[in-house]
């Protein structure tokens, strides 16, 4: 069992260690507003030519970097290694390790007054000068001139691979420091490729936390099982899969949701937005009933 903290307080991390809990530092990866003034050129550009530096998609905090810019991967690797060096930190947890959502979960469309039944130019990244030049060097084509970019597999793979290379650089650095590395990822992983250009099935992390928030997709608890099954099959024993569950979505089907996760091969679960002490006790009783051990 463990806890993830978005920040660092040595006393909290030490208390976790004393209680027999792992303590992991959770930090956003590609979404880095702290670089807005230092490296404005590092930020991703959509197909309309708009940069997340000054016109982010959806919400103001969506300040995503371009993974192809020189210096981005090394900056991120160095940052996570600094975190890994901190006392009592057992590992680092990556989040927002992707491009902005080219397709949002369907339940969120109404929040922005959009219907994403196709890819919209303003949410399709990255078309900065670096990405265009690198893709043209590889293929002889300018991605801005592609008639159907959403169907061009070379262009899709170019962006999937760009994120993977950044993750590989971070992973190598963190593991060299002897620490664990995990990530919050989109469910699937087939959905992750389509929605956020995230090919996490080809990463080499120690654990994955697919965000299987069934309510976001108007799905019932059975969908949790299908998503876990695909995730477990994809990693094929190379890493652990912890089903990320949105507590308000599963509160009324708590045990059913847990069954769907564990019966389909999840090594464990993580909860977002809760649960209360009452449900933590229910969770402990569930684990005892199933004969499942906390790690």
Predicted features and spans:
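Polysaccharide-binding and catalytic clefts of secreted carbohydrate-active enzymes
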Residues: 57-205, 211-218
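Catalytic domains of carbohydrate-active enzymes, especially glycoside hydrolases
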Residues: 1-12, 86-91, 202-208, 261-269
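Substrate-binding cleft of secreted/luminal carbohydrate-active enzymes
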Residues: 205, 210-223, 227-231, 237-295
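Active-site beta-loop-alpha junctions enriched in small/polar residues
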Residues: 8, 28-30, 94-99, 186-188, ...
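Generic structural signal for hydrophobic
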Residues: 16, 76, 83-84, 200, ...
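Aromatic-lined substrate-binding rim segments of carbohydrate-active enzymes
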Residues: 1-46, 154-178
């Amino acid at each position: 069992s463990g806890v993830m903290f978005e920040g660092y307080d040595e006393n909290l991390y030490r208390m976790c260690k004393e209680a027999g809990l792992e303590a992991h530092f959770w930090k956003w990866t590609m979404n880095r507003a702290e670089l807005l003034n230092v490296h404005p050129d590092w930020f991703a550009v959509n197909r309309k030519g708009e940069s997340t530096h000054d016109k982010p998609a959806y919400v103001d905090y969506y300040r995503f970097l371009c993974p192809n810019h020189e210096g981005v991967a090394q900056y991120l690797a160095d940052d996570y290694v600094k975190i890994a060096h901190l006392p009592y930190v057992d590992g680092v947890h990556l989040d927002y390790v992707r491009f902005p959502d080219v397709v949002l979960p369907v339940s969120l469309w109404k929040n922005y007054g959009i219907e994403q039944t196709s890819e919209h130019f303003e949410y399709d990244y990255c078309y900065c000068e670096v990405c265009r030049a690198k893709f043209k060097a590889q293929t002889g084509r300018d991605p801005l001139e592609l008639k159907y970019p959403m169907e061009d597999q070379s262009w899709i793979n170019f962006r999937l691979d760009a994120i993977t290379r950044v993750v590989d650089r971070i992973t190598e650095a963190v593991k060299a420091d002897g620490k664990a590395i995990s990530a919050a990822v989109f469910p699937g992983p087939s959905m992750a490729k389509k929605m956020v250009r995230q090919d996490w099935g080809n990463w080499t992390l120690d654990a994955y936390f697919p965000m299987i928030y069934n309510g976001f997709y108007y799905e019932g608890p059975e969908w949790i099982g299908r998503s876990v099954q695909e995730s477990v099959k994809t990693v094929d024993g190379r890493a652990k899969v912890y089903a990320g569950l949105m507590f308000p979505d599963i509160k009324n089907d708590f045990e059913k949701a847990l069954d769907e996760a564990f019966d389909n091969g999840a090594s464990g679960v993580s909860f977002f937005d809760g649960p209360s002490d009452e449900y933590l006790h229910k969770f402990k009783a569930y684990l005892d009933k199933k004969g499942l051990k906390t790690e």
